[in-house]
Amino acid sequence: MKRAFASLFVILILLASCKSKSEKITVKSEDGSKATIDVSSLADNAEKMKNRNEELQKLTPLTLDELKALLPEEIMGAKRDNMEATKMAGLANFSKADYKIDDSTDVSLSVFDCAGTAGAGYYNMAFLGMMSFEKDNEEEYTKTIDFKGDRAIESCRKKQNRCEFTFFGKDRYMVQLKGDNVGIDKLKQIGSDLPLK
């Protein structure tokens, strides 16, 4: 795990130090999708990731009951349903619940505890997705944003009203909100209201 993290850190530093005069790189695929990466912040983000990883490894992972307690009773007036909490060897422990607002509208909340060695490893994988980038095509868009002083990812399918919002909270939780017929602004508001930020 540490060897993989060290390799990743070196690659990120090399990318940042070898950047061209342009601080953003845009790649376009054959299907018209575009992805833009802001290389100016790679070195800073890699250092932040390394420091946070070291702190996460020192923390003790939560129990199943503590994980379940992270899930609110209600979101948007909908009661918590299909709740589960899972401890998996080698992966981050997580809790998850669904909140059905009506027949076509629902929110799913997942909270990953990034504490301990396994959780810190999950954080490293998830954090790579939080480097500064933007992807856009006819079907969907995904981009990193600033959310209360930290990186977050927002993603929406354009033809359906289906969005996802992922952020890091309380210096240990990777929080993911998914909404069917719930827009990205509403998911951000829900994320702001959770006691996890």
Identify the function of each model-found stretch.
Residues 26-52:
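Post-signal peptide N-terminal segment of mature Sec-exported envelope proteins
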Residues 4, 30, 42, 102-104, ...:
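Generic structural motif
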Residues 9, 93, 105, 171-173:
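Residues at beta-strand starts and edge strands
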Residues 18-21:
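Bacterial signal peptide processing site
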Residues 54-154:
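Short, solvent-exposed recognition patches
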Residues 1-16:
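Sec-dependent bacterial lipoprotein signal peptides
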Residues 41-45, 49-50, 135-197:
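A short, solvent-exposed beta-edge/loop patch
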Residues 1, 23-25:
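N-terminal export/targeting signals for secretion/compartment entry
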